[in-house]
Regions:
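Composition-driven recognition of glycine/serine/threonine/acidic- and proline-rich low-complexity segments
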Residues: 2-191
Length: 191
């Protein structure tokens, strides 16, 4: 087995580079993307799309009438040095010294024996039902010190794949220890 095949791969959301922890290497940097919030169907996962895509052959597919759509992600909040509608960067990271990488919601520290790669806040699309956009999106851990993409125009509202911070709702989620309306943290840990 080659050296580069050992370890774990994870994505740092909201940053243009990987954390310099335990020999972490950047596999590639990219643009956070996913399906548009207003379209039914399609994928539910958020992707880190490379800056230098390889195009599909010109004869595939023969019709684009029934294609799913990929949009870049936009922040739908202001925090630190990012602003509403800024585009979201990402970096895919390889950690040779780890066999597992885990995102833990509602925590800012890792369990004993695990190493923190980064911590931040849960984000996802806002499915409040105000516009009848009932569909699924994944939750991702946005870095606590997020960047914005410098390519293109800042704060250009495309309203494609949009990211909102996540808050706790009491009921089946017990309060305490959770608090109604409180933003939910997250941490990415390796072992």
């Amino acid at each position: 087995m080659a050296d580069q095949d050992v370890g774990s791969v994870y994505t740092t959301w909201g940053r243009k580079s990987c954390p310099a922890i335990n020999g972490t290497k950047t596999v590639y940097t990219g643009i956070t993307g996913g399906k548009p919030y207003h379209e039914m169907g399609g994928g539910v996962n958020t992707l880190c799309l490379p800056h230098d895509p390889d195009n599909a052959p010109s004869n595939f597919p023969t019709s684009q009438e029934s294609a799913a759509h990929m949009y870049g992600s936009e922040y739908q909040f202001t925090y630190g040095n990012i602003a509403w509608d800024d585009d979201v960067p990402c970096a895919v990271c390889h950690l040779k010294s780890a066999t597992s990488v885990l995102m833990i919601p509602a925590k800012t520290t890792c369990p004993s024996g695990w190493t923190m790669q980064y911590h931040g806040y849960l984000v996802t699309d806002n499915n409040d039902g105000a516009h009848n956009y009932w569909h699924a999106f994944d939750f991702i851990c946005l870095h606590s010190d997020p960047n914005y993409l410098t390519e293109g125009a800042r704060q250009h509202n495309m309203d494609g794949h949009i990211l909102f911070p996540v808050t706790a709702v009491c009921g089946s989620l017990p309060c305490p220890p959770y608090k109604a309306g409180q933003y939910i943290t997250c941490v990415v840990c390796s072992s």
